Amino acid sequence: MAGNSIGKLFRVTTFGESHGPKLGCIIDGTPPGLEISENDFQKELDRRRPGTSKYTTQRRELDKITILSGIFQGKTTGTSIGLTVKNTDQRSQDYNNIQKLFRPGHADFTYYKKYGIRDPRGGGRSSARETVMRVAAGAIAKKYLYTKYGILIRGYLKQIGNITCKLKSWNEVEKNPFFCPDVKQINNLNLLIKKLKKEGDSIGAKIKIIAEKVPIGLGEPVFDRLDADLAHSLMSINAVKGVEIGDGFAVVNQKGSEHRDEMNKHGFTNNHAGGILGGISNGENIIATIALKPTSSIKKIGKTIDLHGREQKISILGRHDPCVGLRAVPIAEAMMSITIMDHILRHRGQCSKTY
């Protein structure tokens, strides 16, 4: 299976399955001398860790990071960084009833048709459990970008179902299990998730990610545009079905006189472009929004087929998130951090810019 790596100069390769003994990653390209500790990794991993909230999956994992290589006496050495996390709370028996069934809306069918074999336990490699190592790698990128360049990357829940959350306070985002910046919507989100769990159903979500203080010049035309690489990295997250940069699909209803980001001696007067022009960062905040589908792992009985093509009924009994968007914020932050980190190293190499 190819496609397990992302990045050119800052390159991340992940491995492992949902119910395997461990997950891991190799990170190449980290500059030497960056101060980083287990706490830096753990802080990010705990933000996406399952079992920490009654609103998400009740699979309880410690997600304790183990550093194998590339870090000595609290600093990166410039060599490959190896990281692993143990799986400790698998319940593979929950999937006994669907070993020969394809879960509708999941990768079961396509994996089996492509490879002729699949791991039915929690989705195997296609499980969102894989993203724990993206967050671990993202912790390195996030710290490097902030320490060296003052770049701050953070996200929040923008929408679940028909409930919209406005960015009223970044402080509120980390105070609730929804990553919601609007305290007035917390109770509505609470009621919605409780209702979905009772019904055995799920719902989709939107997440917005913002990178502040990104320097001008990141991105390479034509095929290595910064926005194209961001779309690639964000779209690679499980359940993501859409990516918007800046105003995204709203530009369809805009006129050129409205959408263009006019300039004066102080800079841009708007940021409809989301901080990227011609595939290159323009110094404004980089803004991206992702749409995540409702998980198909639900208790509601549905229709499917088995390995022999016979029609069957299916109900998923495993522990699952009623809304995968509730734990997607740190994952999206990590992927944006990894992509910007890669591009800042590429820009430094090509243009000798260190800012």
UniProtKB/Swiss-Prot annotation:
Protein residues bound to NADP(+) = 48
Recorded catalytic reaction(s): these are: 5-O-(1-carboxyvinyl)-3-phosphoshikimate = chorismate + phosphate
> Which top EC class is given?
lyase
Known pathway: Metabolic intermediate biosynthesis; chorismate biosynthesis; chorismate from D-erythrose 4-phosphate and phosphoenolpyruvate: step 7/7
Cited function: This reaction introduces a second double bond into the aromatic ring system.
The similarity comment for this entry is: Belongs to the chorismate synthase family.
The molecule here is called Chorismate synthase
* Upper taxonomic lineage: Bacteria, Pseudomonadati, Pseudomonadota, Gammaproteobacteria, Enterobacterales
